[in-house]
Amino acid sequence: MDIKAMFMESPFVYGMAVFGKWFTDREEDAKRLSANFTHGINTILISPRRWGKTSLVLKVAKQVSNKNLKIVNLDIFSCRSREDFYRIFAKEIILQTSNKWEEWSENARHFLSALTPTISLGNDPVNDFNVSFSVSNKILLNDEVLNLPVKIANKKGIRIVVCIDEFQQIMEFQDPKNFQKQLRSVWQLQTQCVSYCLYGSKKHLMHALFSKQSMPFYKFGDVFFLQKISLDYWITFIQQRFEETGKFISADLATQICERVENHSSYVQQLSWLVWSKTEKEATEIDFNDAQIDLLNQNSMLYHSYIEGLTALQLNFLHAIADGIQDRFSRKEIISKYNLGTSANISRMKKSLEQKELIDIAPEMITFNDPIFRIWFKKFVPILYQ
């Protein structure tokens, strides 16, 4: 069964990008992103994992795309080196700026002729088309590939927006700051016909890439911190999806779903689905409670992997955050209650847990990145005493 057919049978969708009637709110976000795409403004989109970044980008890309404006989407999560990046970048630019597979090989050889590219094209052109390079001149490789969008845009008389998901992955490359400098030096000269939308799921790394004055991408474009969808929109969305499938859920129960998962987009959809699947005609408190148990059970193995390797002090620090402690962790009563050792441990634990993507540190708030993990953690993981 294809994805669209599956969507027709499911009132709620999670774990993948959503579209159409499964996409709710983000109206102001979509307007801002649409204006940036249309007017050639570079965009940096930052938020924790599974808040709907990819869905938003794909929605806006579909809305603004036309014969004069091409949107290229690529995901670099699998890239482990600059060479991986160059291959994926070149491949997707070529694939997504032409509707005719016959042009792909021709364009690769024409626009990348200085690199003598190797083209492979199998029985399935879309999935089997690949570009590779055997050039030893790294500067030439960098310049030729990164300028590919400009060359194509100029030849076709169009504008191109290149959207790169999991952009923080470049921090894992060898000599990452040098690579960032190379990207910035080329991309900042392409403003006439090419712009970029850079986004990723590791908020602390994305923030470090774009918000620190010492980093090459500082002030590269419009830094866009995505917020959670508001409760009112979610309530309406949940009730409509139930109604359209011949079922009913009260505004109060829809509110409980949202509040339980702290308006986390993916979990609102998942918990709503679990409640819906248990509902005969009208959703009840029993359906809601049973769905919560299922949600914890479905994620239990994942949460066990989260805590593997954590020290007793780190686990105890998570307990403090789970109980709503936001600051002043060095107070004697907090250190004593949660067995945090010494005050010198606090900053190290915060940094370590943020790097592991378990917590989100805002100026006045520290929270769990995953609200259901917080519930599971409080329920199943005890405070450890030495």
Where are these regions (language model features)?
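A short, basic N-terminal segment
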Residues: 1-43, 48, 360, 372, ...
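C-terminal leucine-rich, beta-strand-based interaction scaffolds used for sensing/assembly
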Residues: 2-10, 297, 301-386
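P-loop NTPase nucleotide-binding core
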Residues: 41-42, 46-51, 55-161, 170, ...
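Alpha-helical DNA-recognition elements
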Residues: 63, 274, 352
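Conserved Walker B catalytic segment
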Residues: 132-202, 211
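Short regulatory helix/loop adjacent to the ATP-binding pocket of P-loop NTPases
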Residues: 203-221
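Conserved AAA+ ATPase "SRH/arginine-finger" region at the nucleotide-binding site
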Residues: 222-233
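Amphipathic alpha-helical "lid/sensor" segments that cap RecA-like P-loop NTPase cores
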Residues: 235-301, 363
